[in-house]
Amino acid sequence: MRGTRVTETASAPRMAPGPPTLDDPWPVALLASKIRGWIERLGTAWVEGEITQWGVSGGNVYGKLKDLNEDATVGFTIWSSVKARIPADLKQGDRVIAAVKPNYWLKGGTLTMQVSDMRHVGLGDLLERLERLRAQLRAEGLFRPERKKRLPFLPHTIGLVTGKDSDAEKDVLRNAQLRWPQVRFRTVYAAVQGDRTVPEVTAALRELDADPEVEVIIVARGGGDFQNLLGFSDESLLRAAAGLSTPLVSAIGHEADRPLLDEVADLRASTPTDAAKRVVPDVAEELVRVHQARARIGTRLTHIIRHEIDRIGHLRTRPALASGSWIVDSRAQDLTRFVARGAELVERCVDREAARVAELRGQLRALSPQATLERGYAIVQNAAGRVVAAPGEAPAGTELRITVSGGSLAATAGKALPSPAQGATNGSLAAPRGK
């Protein structure tokens, strides 16, 4: 039965198959045929991508084409007959537009894209895209000079992002160590062209930026084709570079069409060698500058010292310092003059005050009781020392003391006498004698 059934299947035409089931499965050839039919209905399509693999075998080209933005890749084949019609300079890393027709190989069960035409993406289109991105980033301020960080004068450790064993790495290290032998590098290798450029360079920048010992970062590549450098104008890479806290030096080395990383970086170097010279000071040049500075300082100090010596010599020739006795002599003359003037003023003051004292003495003498006594008046006192102002105060027989200008007399009161026509004005004074 099994053999009969196989014979019938092979010899008899099969009707259109229904849906495959467990009881009625499709043969592999039928499934493969249907897949090829579905794929062939797609026809030829123009696609844009980046060549990530390019190999030639037997005159044919076998390669892979990667999407420019998404993580998608397809293989392609260019037969030798077609290869003769496409640009001869196509290579890995180029951005291209290709006319591809999907082809499913039944025997091998593989899908390939047969290329009937392939050409570079127009430079005009690429430049237009870059200019739009440049304008956008400029409007956001990523190119402003004031946001650029200053490079350290002598970095202790320099971060380097470059291709492994590349000429750019050798140029940077050799020139930096020639200028300053003690300089240290921390190198992180990354793809510098192709589809891995953006993610690997971005990761390397962030790794070095997180290292506290790294004081400046150099991204170096030894020039190359414009299309090979497009990764250094990728928006995600540019924004990552703008967000670094460590100063960044771009040394891509392409003068004709500078990648946008040159605009975002804190410093743009024309070549990797130029980057080493801009980042690392030359020890020989610095020693020359030190010697020159010391010479300038010595010359300046000598000039200052000579100027001060001349000024001191000039001061010493002045009379005040040439002979100091004139100061004492002039002050001695002033002192003599002031002493004479003071003596004169004191003498005048004494004479004036002496005259005033004499005047006051005369006034005092004229007003004193002694002056009254000298004019012939007397003071009469009883035995108790009280002044007798009226006859009734000294009855007859009272012992009296009479004071005159020349002294005192003892007396005894007699009887009272009548008051004369011109009596004394002061009851305590007796009438003048000898009148």
UniProtKB/Swiss-Prot annotation:
Species of the source: Leifsonia xyli subsp. xyli (strain CTCB07)
Taxonomy, superkingdom: Bacteria
Quaternary structure, from the entry: Heterooligomer composed of large and small subunits.
HAMAP family given in the database record: Exonuc_7_L
GO biological process: one example: DNA catabolic process
Subcellular localization, as worded in the UniProt entry: Cytoplasm
Family listed: Belongs to the XseA family.
Disulfide cysteine pairs (residue numbers): none
Protein name, as recorded: Exodeoxyribonuclease 7 large subunit
Annotated region described as Disordered, given as residue ranges: 1-21, 413-435
Cellular component terms (Gene Ontology): cytoplasm; exodeoxyribonuclease VII complex
EC number of the protein: 3.1.11.6
Catalytic activity: Exonucleolytic cleavage in either 5'- to 3'- or 3'- to 5'-direction to yield nucleoside 5'-phosphates
Keywords from the named record: Cytoplasm, Exonuclease, Hydrolase, Nuclease
Main location: cytoplasm
Role summary: Bidirectionally degrades single-stranded DNA into large acid-insoluble oligonucleotides, which are then degraded further into small acid-soluble oligonucleotides.
Pfam families: Exonuc_VII_L (PF02601), tRNA_anti_2 (PF13742)
GO molecular function annotation: exodeoxyribonuclease VII activity; nucleic acid binding
Compositionally biased tracts (Polar residues): 1-10
